[in-house]
Amino acid sequence: MSLHSPGQAFRAALAKENPLQIVGAINANHALLAQRAGYQAIYLSGGGVAAGSLGLPDLGISTLDDVLTDIRRITDVCPLPLLVDADIGFGSSAFNVARTVKSIAKAGAAALHIEDQVGAKRCGHRPNKAIVSKEEMVDRIRAAVDARTDPNFVIMARTDALAVEGLEAALDRAQAYVDAGADMLFPEAITELSMYRRFADVAQVPILANITEFGATPLFTTDELRSAHVAMALYPLSAFRAMNRAAEKVYTVLRQEGTQKNVIDIMQTRNELYESINYYQFEEKLDALYRNKKS
């Protein structure tokens, strides 16, 4: 296996930065913006695919193909290692999970997380979640680990058990998931910093903290997370939320005032856009090709 596989790049980033900040990229353009800002890893949110690409809620409606489309668009242009939200594995059988792992890895992702919610899943920070048995989730993880062909591809287990069964049961699940082969752990909707320390002590694998806005988890700083032995800080939809609010403002002002003059200051300039997508390099290449064609 190549030493430069996406999975190895993700693990290398994790080794260099503590905690590793992983930002959500709703599309390929945002992936490039994250790269320019200096991030070492990016994330594709299942809720982001549903809301951003499909205009639908995060209730298990998106398909594997929906996710693969967005993965390919990102990995085609951005070299940063990509962590992907694989929900419950896009199907109820081990074969579904295996197909999901193989497909996501083939599309160029570095890592995925798979969760222990039931098929009719909900956003991890909403009420009335339901989870499968510990044994069923262990089977999902085993199927995922068995399906990968690159040992560096990261299989991360997410558990939503805290809100459903309590901390001790969630810790018990965490240990079982690691024993089943999970490389890293994503305890969802954590409410206290000390809980992360418990997961880190029990699991003895890298722990991810989902620092999403307007949810159950406080907006802990990287210093606070580091003190709690958190290895990864995830910001799944921060830029997406800001983008949506900016779009709402522009649409409203343009409709009400008949001009965009009063919102120009919040817009990315033409030159800034071109620089972020390497427009000028493409243009220079095009000019060179036409010069060669004429000569």
Swiss-Prot record:
Which keywords label this protein? Lyase, Magnesium, Metal-binding
Highest taxon in the source lineage: Bacteria
Q: How does its activity depend on thermal conditions?
A: Optimum temperature is 50 degrees Celsius.
Q: What is the effect of changing H125A?
A: 750-fold decrease in the catalytic efficiency. Retains the same oligomeric state of the wild-type
- pH note: Optimum pH is 7.5.
Entry-linked Pfam families: PEP_mutase (PF13714)
Statement: the UniProt record of this protein carries the keyword Lyase:
yes
Which EC number(s) does the record attach to this protein?
4.1.3.30
What Gene3D superfamilies does this protein map onto?
Phosphoenolpyruvate-binding domains
Chain sites annotated for binding substrate:
S45, G46, G47, C123, G124, R158, E188, N210, I211, T212, R241, R270
Cofactor names from the entry are: Mg(2+)
Entries under SUPFAM superfamilies matching the protein: Phosphoenolpyruvate/pyruvate domain
What do mutants without this gene show? Answer: Cells lacking this gene are unable to accumulate 2-methylcitrate and 2-methyl-cis-aconitate.
**Catalytic activity, per the record?**
(2S,3R)-3-hydroxybutane-1,2,3-tricarboxylate = pyruvate + succinate
Q: Name one GO molecular function term.
A: molecular function activator activity
The outcome of changing C123A is: Inactive. Retains the same oligomeric state of the wild-type
What is any one GO biological process for this UniProt entry? propionate catabolic process, 2-methylcitrate cycle
Quick one: which residues bind Mg(2+)?
D85, D87
What else is noted? In vitro, dithiothreitol (DTT) or reduced glutathione (GSH) are required for optimal activity.
Q: What NCBIfam families is this protein classified in?
A: PRK11320.1, prpB
What family is reported?
Belongs to the isocitrate lyase/PEP mutase superfamily. Methylisocitrate lyase family.
What is the recorded function of this protein according to its Swiss-Prot or TrEMBL entry? Involved in the catabolism of short chain fatty acids (SCFA) via the 2-methylcitrate cycle I (propionate degradation route). Catalyzes the thermodynamically favored C-C bond cleavage of (2R,3S)-2-methylisocitrate to yield pyruvate and succinate via an alpha-carboxy-carbanion intermediate.
Query: Partners and quaternary state?
Result: Homotetramer; dimer of dimers.
Q: What is this protein called?
A: 2-methylisocitrate lyase
Q: Which organism is it from?
A: Salmonella typhimurium (strain LT2 / SGSC1412 / ATCC 700720)
Gene of this entry: prpB
